């Protein structure tokens, strides 16, 4: 967990995750949260909120990504990088985390190897590797 802020009015803790990137897309909530590679970031924030709640903390219903986006349009590096910063709100949803943990635990303790997921990039890599006999 990167950080926890305190909401002075609601008296709740706020889950914060710091991220850095060098993306040419405009840094908006919609662009950031709709990126397929950021799905795991949302899960990560939800898990942090779940853990805090189960430790007895009252968790604010929104978490935030503090994103630093490097400017890729500079002529050169010259010993410095410029960043655009944005705070991206995310509506937390962690009611399913416990069932996911139980499912993972069951899978880890099973002697059966699950079928691969056709949409999983890691599974595709493993299938390709296996087809090459590596």
Model-found features: residue ranges?
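Generic internal hydrophobic packing segments that stabilize the cores of diverse globular domains
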Residues: 1-2, 42-45, 94
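Conserved catalytic cores of phosphodiester-cleaving nucleases, focusing on short active-site segments
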Residues: 1-32, 48
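A structure-centric signal for secondary-structure junctions around beta-strands
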Residues: 10-12, 42, 60, 117
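Short histidine-centered catalytic/ligand-binding loop motif
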Residues: 24-39, 83-91
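Short, charged/polar micro-motifs that form catalytic or ligand-binding hotspots
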Residues: 34-42, 110-113
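An active-site-proximal "capping" alpha-helix that borders the catalytic cofactor pocket
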Residues: 41-53
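Metal-dependent nuclease catalytic regions and adjoining charged, substrate-binding loops involved
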Residues: 51-134
């Amino acid at each position: 967990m990167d950080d926890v802020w305190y909401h002075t009015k609601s008296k709740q803790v706020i889950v914060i995750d710091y991220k850095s990137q060098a993306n040419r897309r405009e840094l908006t909530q919609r662009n950031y949260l709709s990126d397929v590679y950021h799905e795991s970031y949302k899960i990560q924030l939800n898990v942090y909120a779940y853990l805090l709640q189960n430790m007895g903390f009252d968790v604010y219903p929104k978490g935030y990504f503090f994103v630093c986006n490097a400017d890729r349009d500079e002529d050169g590096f010259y010993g410095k990088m410029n960043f655009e910063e944005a705070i991206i709100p995310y509506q937390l949803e962690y009611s399913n985390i416990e069932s996911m943990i139980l499912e993972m635990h069951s899978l880890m303790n099973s002697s059966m190897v699950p079928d691969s997921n056709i949409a999983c990039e890691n599974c595709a890599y493993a299938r390709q590797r296996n087809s090459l006999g590596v």
